[in-house]
Amino acid sequence: MDRDRIGEYDALVLVSLVWFLGKFVRYLFPPLFESIQEAYGVSNATVGTAFTGFMLVYALLQFPSGAVADRLGPVRVIVAGALVAGAGSLAIVFDAPFAALVAAMVVIGAGTGVHKTVSVRLIARVYPARTGRMLGAHDTLGAMGGVAAPAVVVAVLSAPPALAAVLARLPGADWRAPFLLTGVLAVGLAVATAVRLSGSPAATGPTDADGDDSPEAQEYLRLFRNPRFSAFVLVTVGFSFAHNGLVAFLPLYLSEAADLATSTANLLYSLVFAVTFVQLVTGDLSDRVGRFPVMVAALGLAATALVALVSLPGLGLGAVAAAVVVAAFGLGSHGFQPVRSAYLMELLPERLAGGGLGVVRTLLMGAGALAPGAVGVIADAVGFRPAFALLAGSMGLAAVVAAGLWLTE
């Protein structure tokens, strides 16, 4: 088999594994919010604000990482990010004050924040005719980190005797143990990526900057003069706010507002990510029938599921109904994501693709970063249901604007 082709698939597999680990460590936190609150005696607003700090740093790294990748290629950026995230994860393993936990979360946010913009740019260049399908594969593997994270948390918090004996040897509380696994794997993947992809034409050649013709910052900002581009950014911002708000507090929402057991709530949380394979379908389908029909359907399903989730506590339908609604939200939200990335890569000029995608992801992740803090504050003030109603409105707005773009295409 041709070595360049092996390199292409190596790139897809390795960057997807790094993305899996980035999602895994991000989604370790929400199922651990209750344990963190018990350990430190902090409120919903406090843990939500801490997670907002994590996500804000993540968001702020989107544009710089894309711009640097436009100049230097993606491999160095991906390797550096994995090493930084690994260091932050290892820091959490040790018992420390709450401020130290927040600082480590910020470091992890910085390390994971450089990855997605760079990996989307890389995959779009390697697979120009199958961008939707390959981004679907990439996002599917990444989202499986969200399936694994709550399952690992449940295993650690209700550890059988053999596992409990191992956890007892660790320097910190049991709930910190998953971060040791994350840190070790992050360092290992960073080394594998550096060794396997450095110098690979598939991984570096297509995405390196061309000569000294580096884009200026003003060129990225001029992208927003295109009304359709700006409108689609609004779609992504509305989606991101709703999605990030839900994934930050869904376990607590299900246990407190829907009155489910904590272990049940954490397992239902994993359903959001267990349906991630829909991305393989929606990515490929969008290559065939167009981006907007798929995006509008996915956003509409996610918005409907959020409305149903807000209604569940008043109906008293229990865990089975909650599982159906959570799975529906997962189908809609995951179904949207690879198509969004593919459409953005089509909108962006070739020379601005990395930094341009970084600008958009900074905005959408910035909005998403504000969501956990907003949900936590509203939940403490008036309850979780009004907070989740706000998320439903944000997702509904995204669906309506996307439908308008489709109708005027």
What would you call each of these model-derived segments?
Residues 60-99:
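Conserved MFS/SLC helix-loop-helix module at the cytosolic interface between two early adjacent transmembrane helices
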Residues 129, 137-201:
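Helix-loop-helix hairpin linking two adjacent transmembrane segments in secondary transporters
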